[in-house]
Amino acid sequence: MANYQNLLVVIDPSQDDQPALRRAVYIVQRNGGRIKAFLPIYDLSYEMTTLLSPEEGSTMRKGVTSQRTAWLKQQAYYYLEAGIDIEIKVVWHNRPYEAIIQEVITGNHDLLLKMTHKHDKLGSLIFTPLDWQLLRKCPCPVWMVKDQIWPDQGSVVVAVNLSNEESYHHELNLKLVKETQELANQVMKNPEIHLVSAYPVAPLNIAIELPDFNPSVYNHALRGQHLIAMKELRQTFCIDEKYTHIHEGLPESVIPQMCDEMNAGIIVLGILGRTGLSAAFLGNTAEHVIDHLKCDILTIKPDGFECPIKAAKE
């Protein structure tokens, strides 16, 4: 159940405004729960000097950590004064993504929120290597927050994969829609939830290579397959047909366009979290889509996902 009660917010040390913290407060005010504002810091210069003893180096690191803790408390000051339950935590760690995921695990956090930046000219979001590490490896849902206010009457879009290739797609679709409905009903008033899916058409040159192949018949059959699967999915969750959308084309083109047309405030995506060679050679549809989006993004892993990062040793 998407009853997020234990939120971890990754703080951006380069910003005086923290949209991810603001979004977390928005959720907690409507749904209850608590927030941990988390900042991993590291400066290689404190590790490389030969002029300091280990004790002096440790003292300097503690000093930097204390300064950042004070700064972070100032960032959260008005929320704390308003009675919002926010824990402040700053840690020294040379791999930020590991520190964040380890904190998720040890703190039993059920939602991770992090700010992302918008490309000045393209409008799409810019994802850093840290963002991608979290999206692929974090065991709990990850909410990437854009640095903009929530659009008026913004809708919620769920991207679903309706192919019959793998059974886990159906299971993940059910999880995405179920958790989206639960979260939206908890934090929004009269949420408008749309289900969106895309299917690729047959290549134009395939008729040349296979003279007996009829692309139009194939495309029609493929669309019919998706319509049947979408009907089954929407009826499972009592979603009206007008809130379901199936379009031909590549997901990375269709889904961002649909989000723009529907003034989406957030899109919910399933992400398999592939790493290593499988990511390099097979790719990941969700990751291709993410690169073209302009709204908030909530990514959810399938049941049974195994996090490659282990909890920090005490």
From Swiss-Prot:
Keyword annotations of the record: Cytoplasm
Source organism superkingdom: Bacteria
Localization annotation: Cytoplasm
Keyword Cytoplasm found: yes
InterPro entries tied to this protein: UspA (IPR006016)
GO CC annotations, alphabetized: cytoplasm
Biological role: Required for resistance to DNA-damaging agents.
Family per similarity comment: Belongs to the universal stress protein A family.
Record protein name field: Universal stress protein E
